[in-house]
């Protein structure tokens, strides 16, 4: 007869457990089993994790932990890991990915304690798979800085990276970030994914001007994954420029569209304006 291990406690160690990013149905069977069998849960917000555990019918000791916790707090958890199975979770998604945890994992490994991962949902990866942007190479850069100057400086440093770029963003800051990307990383496709795995999930892809116009008319809500395609391999040809011009004309006057495409491509603004007038007639 096969022995049922589900009721047995886990071996001592740190268990990095991914949790849903919006849809509770996305939690894995292994994550549920780990949370059920562990001795305690280190979490970013005890209220958020408490709700998840209640939904799963699990009662556990919750220890608040984030990367602002001092060294003494980490020392206590590391000491406990030598004798107990401790699950590490964030409010949503995979711990350590723009969420607390790396200092705790580092300290546990430095102490030669067992560390394992129970993988699952990650908003950055979910957004990339929906975006339609190249996914063979990508760089996740967390949240863009709040201040405009720092935001532009960060984008300038990332401009040469030959990969799709992934950021997290909030609804109120999206337009400012789109404007900065349009300025610092011109002629690149941008994708905005929001409310991932939820009822009103949305993913839009386009150039900066078109996306800014859309979100000015439809202020976004919820958490956002903001993605930027890699640098173009070569200067756009006339066909590419016309496609950009057609898209820009959906939200701009001919003169504005010509200026936008000229800035992005380096093509002559007068020629683009003449073509824009032809396309409008």
UniProtKB/Swiss-Prot annotation:
Major location (coarse): cytoplasm
The source's superkingdom equals: Bacteria
Gene Ontology MF annotations: rRNA (cytosine-2'-O-)-methyltransferase activity
The EC number(s) attached to this protein equal: 2.1.1.198
Transmembrane annotation, as ranges: none
User: Could you tell me where this protein is found in the cell?
Assistant: Cytoplasm
Q: Which catalysed reactions does the entry list for this protein? A: cytidine(1402) in 16S rRNA + S-adenosyl-L-methionine = 2'-O-methylcytidine(1402) in 16S rRNA + S-adenosyl-L-homocysteine + H(+)
Checking InterPro entries in the record gives: 4pyrrol_Mease (IPR000878), 4pyrrol_Methylase_sf (IPR035996), 4pyrrole_Mease_sub1 (IPR014777), 4pyrrole_Mease_sub2 (IPR014776), rRNA_ssu_MeTfrase_I (IPR008189), RsmI_HTH (IPR053910), SAM_MeTrfase_RsmI_CS (IPR018063)
A single GO cellular-component term from the record reads:
cytoplasm
**EC top class named in words:** transferase
Annotated coiled-coil positions are: none
Q: Name one Pfam family in it.
A: RsmI_C
For this UniProt record, the keywords arranged alphabetically read as follows: Cytoplasm, Methyltransferase, rRNA processing, S-adenosyl-L-methionine, Transferase
Family annotation (PANTHER family): RIBOSOMAL RNA SMALL SUBUNIT METHYLTRANSFERASE I (PTHR46111:SF1)
**Which family does this protein fall into?**
Belongs to the methyltransferase superfamily. RsmI family.
Instruction: Provide the function of this protein.
Output: Catalyzes the 2'-O-methylation of the ribose of cytidine 1402 (C1402) in 16S rRNA.
**HAMAP family linked:** 16SrRNA_methyltr_I
Q: Please state what the protein is called.
A: Ribosomal RNA small subunit methyltransferase I
What organism does this protein naturally occur in?
Erythrobacter litoralis (strain HTCC2594)
Gene encoding the protein: rsmI
